[in-house]
Amino acid sequence: QTMYYSTLNQKNFNPDDFRAIKFVIQGGSQPLPSIQQAFKKYGINIINGYGLTEAPLVMVNTPENARHKPMSIGKSVMFVDAKVLDEDKNEVGDGEIGELAIRSKNVTPGYWGQPEETKKSFHNQYFLTGDLAKKDEDGDIYIIDRKKELIITGGENVLPSEVENALAEHPLIDRCVVVGYEHPKYGESIAAAIILREKVPDYVEQLDKHMRERLAGYKVPRMYLPVTHMPLNSTQKPDKLVIREMMNSKVNKESSSEANHNA
């Protein structure tokens, strides 16, 4: 995803240089629909693959299937068995969201020297990936989000990817990452780190209106943090831990400033 953003935003980006390319395969994180659509304008399909450090290449979509289901990671490759499980480790129905679990010879037998971590990462020989997913009636699988990144605000579950997808549709947004931050009343609230294409004074009002037209009120970010560069981790993915710390720090500073003002 980081590479696709960078490619599109290069000043010397020329679509003619990519005329011979019909599709590219990506993994690591799922591109936003806006990125898929941007590449499709140039006749390039982004095909999603899926794998983990614990299980290299588990699934990959096909060029033909990607035309109709661009956000799918396709079906399991040969000798890989995949299920989508609920919290009680029961398989969910088509279209329902649960945790993706896989069983195969290429799955790690466990974590070296960490028996407890190994034990909680497996269920009946299936490795629990930590990724929320759903399966359609054709057996194609879609990654929804990381389970641990689910935001619970006032008892409501919010998928960061859903908020990011809606936010990315606004013409002001060049890039966005959504996280939960500590909130005294709701436990967590929603914040977005954003890179703006253009600096305008009323960007918060514009984004808030845009989001409320697309999502339920509890899914709308309560805070926006403009940044010039998105923090990335060692694998060049957005570093949500750092971004979350930035949000909490911003809230604490604002609370401290307000307390001093009222003193």
Language-model features: locations:
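AMP-binding/adenylate-forming catalytic core of the ANL superfamily
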Residues: 88, 104, 109-110, 117-120, ...
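Gly/Ser/Thr-rich phosphate-binding loop
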Residues: 4-68, 81
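Short Gly/Pro-enriched turn/cap motifs at secondary-structure boundaries
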Residues: 71-77, 91, 121-125
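Beta-strand->loop->alpha-helix junctions that form or flank phosphate-binding loops
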Residues: 47-54, 74-75, 179-182, 225
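Hydrophobic/anchoring residues in structured secondary elements
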Residues: 23-26, 178, 225-226
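AMP-binding/adenylate-forming core of the ANL superfamily
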Residues: 83, 94-108, 126, 132-133
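Acidic/polar alpha-helix N-cap and adjacent early helical turns
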Residues: 245-263
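Active-site glycine-centered loops adjacent to acidic/histidine catalytic or metal-binding residues
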Residues: 28, 51, 74, 89, ...
